[in-house]
Amino acid sequence: MGGGGTLVDGFRRLFHRRTASGSNQSSNAGEEAASSDLEVADDPDLVALRSIRIRVPKRKMPLPVESHKKNTVEMEFFTEYGEASQYQIQEVIGKGSYGVVAAAVDTRTGERVAIKKINDVFEHVSDATRILREIKLLRLLRHPDIVEIKHIMLPPSRREFQDIYVVFELMESDLHQVIRANDDLTPEHYQFFLYQLLRALKYIHAANVFHRDLKPKNILANSDCKLKICDFGLARASFNDAPSAIFWTDYVATRWYRAPELCGSFFSKYTPAIDIWSIGCIFAELLTGRPLFPGKNVVHQLDIITDLLGTPSSETLSRIRNEKARRYLSTMRKKHAVPFSQKFRNTDPLALRLLERLLAFDPKDRSSAEEALADPYFASLANVEREPSRHPISKLEFEFERRKLTKDDVRELIYREILEYHPQMLQEYMKGGEQISFLYPSGVDRFKRQFAHLEENYSKGERGSPLQRKHASLPRERVGVSKDGYNQQNTNDQERSADSVARTTVSPPMSQDAQQHGSAGQNGVTSTDLSSRSYLKSASISASKCVAVKDNKEPEDDYISEEMEGSVDGLSEQVSRMHS
């Protein structure tokens, strides 16, 4: 298909037939571009593609609120003055050990948003530092394909506040759920999804930032095919003088999407290629509907990677700095690479050629995001004007990473970040004002009471039963999946075309397991495991785990304790012990 160029023309014609909706989308996109640091106009090709709908699991609407309760439940969520009156709360959409998330409407723009209350931010300095890092990165990385912080509520006290209220744009679902709910995604979907991810990654890497945890659950999605990368809780800004060991000691990796060099500390300096590998794994999962490398442990992960790619060349082995990892791979039985055309049958050859470049075992052989965007696979989409870059982030922004922080240090740094969303107060702060928080009315006190009321009703089910979601990362809405995590519905053999894509707005029938799971939830029976381990999987503000996650027999996450390992070299020790 040459990258789907002919169907793009068809999408464009479809777009012109929908001039009314298209103009609305264009105007909304223009407002977005005006409010960000980027001047990225929506190209007609992209707008046309986004008019082709995909299935996203839908949330039930909350039960109607009785008129005499409306004031206490919704209208008085914020104070009657200042910033708080800007948002009208609708319902709680997630709750966990970190806090609670509510869906709301911005009364000035009509936009739906997610307001996330993070409880006791400073209870653990490490988690508070991660929140600081993510708030800062999401402020600095403003891009159409990266989730955006709309606002952060000003706390009532500069030196004593404990909770944070962050306002995000509200997305419908995530890519993990989209893959499971759609068994008829087309090559045009695959192409457009990958294009957006690489466009975001080009911008992130130009800033010298590594995301380090790219996976389908950390990519938000809407039914118009729009994707946004979220969860920068593990991201790092890379500077040339930063020691590699320090840079990676707190790395909590998602094994299934982890680059091979991270499975054993293979190379002396890590590069943006670690994110490129993750994108390759995600692209392969889009093509097949299943994870490409579902390793059960580090050794198994390396085994299944080499089963597909073959054993590394002698040149690659010679560059591996870790002796144990080098010896393990050297003694591995010789494997020949499996042709991608055999692994991914009936797939566009251009897509497979690009996938091979994304999944090269040696990081130096992987394409950069910019190089991948120039690949012939994107001939019908590529446009440098809508693929912005940026200057590297200043090292001064992350000077706090170089010193040991106290709770008060982190509180002051987070307060400074919050003021970025309050320009008048920021000016006072820069002048050295000590009482600035009392010059500007804060709605947080009333906000706390309203959240407490909503949480109580949420637990009692008075505003509608919360939807089941196995992996809940907010501000994403919660959706249901089958027990085994995969869509069991048999695919139809019908021809997939632009017209069929346009009709994919209704979720497919659930599998038998999913139906049983759903009926159990309706009867008030739940099987969630309320473990702190599930809650603490992520301290991210844009994608924290908010409900319990049932233990998986083959977990995709490895938890690497800084105290236990000291450095990422400990992974090689694990490889050696498990192999012996």
From Swiss-Prot:
Its EC number is 2.7.11.24. Residues 18-38, 458-580 are annotated as: Disordered. The active site is at 213 (proton acceptor). Dually phosphorylated on Thr-249 and Tyr-251, which activates the enzyme. Phosphorylated on tyrosine residue. Induction: By hydrogen peroxide, salicylic acid (SA), jasmonic acid (JA), ethylene, abscisic acid (ABA), fungal elicitor, infection with rice blast fungus (M.grisea) and wounding. The modification Phosphotyrosine is found at residue 251. GO terms for biological process: defense response; intracellular signal transduction. Keywords: ATP-binding, Cytoplasm, Kinase, Nucleotide-binding, Nucleus, Phosphoprotein, Plant defense, Serine/threonine-protein kinase, Transferase. The modification Phosphothreonine is found at residue 249. Transmembrane segments: none annotated. Residues 325-506 are annotated as: Required for kinase activity and nuclear localization. GO terms for molecular function: ATP binding; MAP kinase activity; protein serine kinase activity; protein serine/threonine kinase activity. It catalyses: L-seryl-[protein] + ATP = O-phospho-L-seryl-[protein] + ADP + H(+); L-threonyl-[protein] + ATP = O-phospho-L-threonyl-[protein] + ADP + H(+). GO terms for cellular component: cytoplasm; nucleus. It is found in: Cytoplasm; Nucleus. A motif (TXY) lies at residues 249-251. It comes from the Eukaryota. Residues 87-378 form the Protein kinase domain. Belongs to the protein kinase superfamily. CMGC Ser/Thr protein kinase family. MAP kinase subfamily. May be involved in defense signaling pathway. Phosphorylates EREBP1 transcriptional activator in vitro. Enhances DNA-binding activity of EREBP1 to the GCC box element of pathogenesis-related (PR) gene promoters. Interacts with EREBP1. This is Mitogen-activated protein kinase 12. It comes from Oryza sativa subsp. japonica (Rice).
